[in-house]
């Protein structure tokens, strides 16, 4: 069983932290959802035993700080910095929710991956929202800004979790 090593790369003023485990096959690169960090992938890491895995904290999440600004294109640049540092030739990118947006943006900007998997609540980055949906998203930004993070995280956990274990570890 290979050991995990925590590594980091600097990208546009932010330290991008990730765990790396050497193994076989193409690199599997995991990108978490909004408000989470790389620890969300713990159950999947068991199934990936023996594979080479890079498990990132996306900019502004977990140990990837400081983060003055965030954008999906910048997160894709951060991902590229990690892949260049690790000399990944044909990684398989796995993104959940916001991580799926980053995977799509990376594919759009850079391409060159063996495969992509975008899972869970990640529409393609095209003009897929109606005018009402776009207005609702714009209105939600200031509302979320006044909601205490602790309460927002708890509400997200309740909405997304189906077991006590998943709720308490979110």
Q: What spans do the regions from the language model cover?
A:
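N-terminal cap/lid segment of alpha/beta-hydrolase-fold proteins
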Residues: 2-15
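Conserved HGGG/HGGXW glycine-rich cap/lid loop of the alpha/beta-hydrolase fold
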Residues: 14-65
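Short glycine-enriched nucleophile-adjacent loop
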Residues: 100-111
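Flexible "cap/lid" loop of the alpha/beta hydrolase fold
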Residues: 108, 116-145
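Ligand-binding pocket scaffold of soluble enzyme catalytic domains
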Residues: 139, 147-148, 152-155
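Conserved small/polar residues in nucleotide/adenosyl-binding loops
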Residues: 168-169
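Active-site loop/oxyanion-hole signature of alpha/beta-hydrolase fold enzymes
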Residues: 42-43, 54-94, 98
